[in-house]
């Protein structure tokens, strides 16, 4: 006979207790999160931005984030994925190795055959985070207003967290009346632990059981030329982290190296990492690169983004980016 796994509180109460986060205080680790908004609110771009940051070991919006292997289910099509990823990397730097995967398969929550295929791919590639874009493209037959259908989806999301050991971020829409929030049954609002609303280029923490409920994170969307034909794609920047491209790459390099150098990253190693990820690094212009690097280091320190500690070591300043 199968049995429930039951824990004794007093066997563990003296342990070091802490919440586990994918993105500190914002997105819980191994729990479902829904990101929703109206058409044109950049919610899909936000999902891709989060995926690219997590997969390259970058923090999101200045909040400490867990480096992850990410799978994007681009169920509305993948035509925008590579152009937008290119625009992102032109401004945040190119990762030295890829931990970001995407696919556009047929998929429906609660379908055992499709879920078995998906789970095999997740385990094969060691995926930690799955982004579903969008909920409406992955729903079983029926209406989101049907509590039974909504329960199938929320139970599936919970299963992916509890049994598969992954964190899910699902992209959703508002209904015809956007003031009523996330489209469909109240089951979504009640049963999903974290809900983020995207409106007017702001991420609003609408529901968060243990973190930053009510916090607001404004962002700006830019266009970036991605090829010699002048074609462009959009990328996202958090408003309180506006920096020059090389400065963003310095921050990315610091975050990549911080686990190896816990007391601070040696300036020489930091410069070497930035050189590797900078798409515009020119071997014939090492002197100008070094000059601009030093200038950017001083500017970042002046604005409190980094700290130059003893012996030429550099650390990232931790900041609370939640706005009132």
Where are these regions (language model features)?
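Conserved RecA-like P-loop NTPase ATPase core
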Residues: 27, 72, 133, 169, ...
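Phosphate-binding/switch region of NTP-binding enzymes
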Residues: 34-35, 40, 44-45, 129, ...
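Hydrophobic positions on the alpha1 helix immediately C-terminal to the Walker A/P-loop
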Residues: 46, 50
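Conserved inter-motif catalytic segment of the P-loop NTP-binding fold
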Residues: 2-4, 18, 22-23, 38-41, ...
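C-terminal regions of RecA-like/P-loop NTPase motor modules
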Residues: 6, 123-126, 163, 201-324
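Pre-Walker A (Motif I) flank of P-loop NTPase domains
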Residues: 29-33, 68
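A short, flexible beta-alpha/helix-coil linker loop
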Residues: 136-139, 174-177, 280
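Non-catalytic, mobile gating and regulatory segments of ester bond hydrolases
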Residues: 10-23, 28-29
């Amino acid at each position: 006979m199968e049995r429930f796994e039951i824990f004794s509180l007093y066997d563990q109460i003296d342990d070091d207790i802490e919440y586990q986060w994918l993105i500190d205080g914002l997105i819980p680790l191994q729990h479902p999160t829904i990101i929703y908004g109206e058409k044109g609110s950049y919610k899909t771009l936000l999902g891709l931005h989060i995926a690219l940051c997590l997969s390259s070991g970058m923090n999101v919006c200045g909040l400490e984030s867990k480096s992850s292997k990410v799978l994007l289910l681009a169920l509305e099509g993948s035509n925008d994925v590579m152009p937008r990823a290119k625009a992102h990397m032109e401004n945040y730097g190119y990762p030295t190795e890829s931990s970001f995967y995407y696919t556009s398969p047929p998929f429906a929550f609660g379908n055992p055959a499709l879920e078995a295929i998906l789970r095999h791919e997740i385990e094969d590639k060691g995926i930690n985070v799955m982004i579903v874009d969008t909920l409406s493209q992955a729903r079983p037959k029926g209406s989101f207003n049907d509590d039974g259908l909504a329960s199938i989806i929320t139970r599936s999301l919970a299963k992916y967290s509890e049994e598969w050991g992954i964190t899910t971020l699902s992209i959703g829409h508002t209904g015809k009346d956007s003031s009523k929030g996330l489209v469909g049954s109240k089951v979504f609002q009640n049963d999903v632990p974290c809900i983020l609303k995207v409106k007017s280029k702001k991420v609003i923490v609408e529901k968060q059981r243990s973190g930053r409920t009510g916090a607001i994170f404004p962002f700006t969307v830019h266009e970036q030329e991605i090829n010699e034909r002048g074609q462009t794609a959009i990328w996202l920047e958090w408003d309180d982290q506006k920096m020059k491209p090389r400065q963003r790459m310095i921050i990315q390099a610091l975050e990549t190296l911080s686990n190896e150098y816990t007391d601070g990253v040696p300036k020489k190693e930091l410069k070497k990492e930035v050189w590797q990820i900078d798409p515009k690094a020119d071997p014939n212009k090492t002197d100008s690169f070094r000059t601009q690097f030093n200038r950017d280091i001083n500017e970042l320190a002046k604005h409190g983004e980094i700290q130059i500690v003893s012996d030429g070591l550099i650390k990232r300043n931790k900041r609370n980016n939640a706005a009132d």
